[in-house]
Structures are given as C-alpha cells and as structure tokens.
Amino acid sequence: MARAEFQMPEDFLDQLSRLEARTDEIVPKVLAAGGEVVLEHVRTRLRAVIGQGTKSPSRSTDELEAALGVSPARLNRNGDWDVKVGFAEPRRGKGDSNAKIANIIEFGKHGQPPRPFLKVAKAASRDGAKAAMIDKLDEEVGKL
C-alpha cells in the first residue's frame, strides 16, 4: 500500500494554534456580522408587508419593527454557536405577543391573507450573510 506523509509549515501551525485559542472571541463577532445582514433583510420585508392589502386603513404603531433584533451569539446544548433574529417580548401595553402578531402576518388567519416576510428574508439574505461572515472571519484571522 502506498503511503504519503506531509509536514505542515511551522508558521501555519502557529497561526492555527492562535486561532484555536481565540475561537471564543472570533465566532461571536463572525455570527454577529451575519446576523446584522439578516436583520436588515427582515426589517425591510416587514416594512413592506405591514399595512399592505388590508380592508381598512393600517393602525400600525411600528412596535413590531421596533422589537426586532439580533440575540448575542451563544453556545446551544449541542455545542454549536447560534445567533437568532427575532422579536423582543413583552409588547408595551395590552394585547398579543410580538411572536403571535408576526406569525399572523407571516401565515395569515381567517379573513386575513398571509404576507410572508420571514421566509422571504431568510432566502434573500442567505448569500449576503455568508459573504459578511466570511469577510469578518478573514479580517479576524488576518489580525492573528
């Protein structure tokens, strides 16, 4: 059986060890960069669908848009890093939760047609978020 052996350059191995030591600093920054791209797409789509196609004039208070945000990067129970784009709770005053209102807008209800904004924003932002995360990772690796 043929056998090949490769030796990695010493400077490359040093850079990998420095990268390993700073992973917990770098990963949240990279995910935050991607999360901001997704957040802007969701915010744009939400603005486009609120008040559109209604029978009566819109009574929107922009409270749903104001509650939209990005969570800090955290390790989940599987050991993977997550960042979430979603709505803060609770809503000011009385009424339904932000998640319920977003769900009604996204999927509709009896007498109210669906106006998807999350699914469309997710699909539209995928490439941009990947590019932003790659750029941020390259920037952080370049600092090593």
Where are these regions (language model features)?
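Short, Lys/Arg-rich flexible segments
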Residues: M1-K84, E89-G93, N98-L144
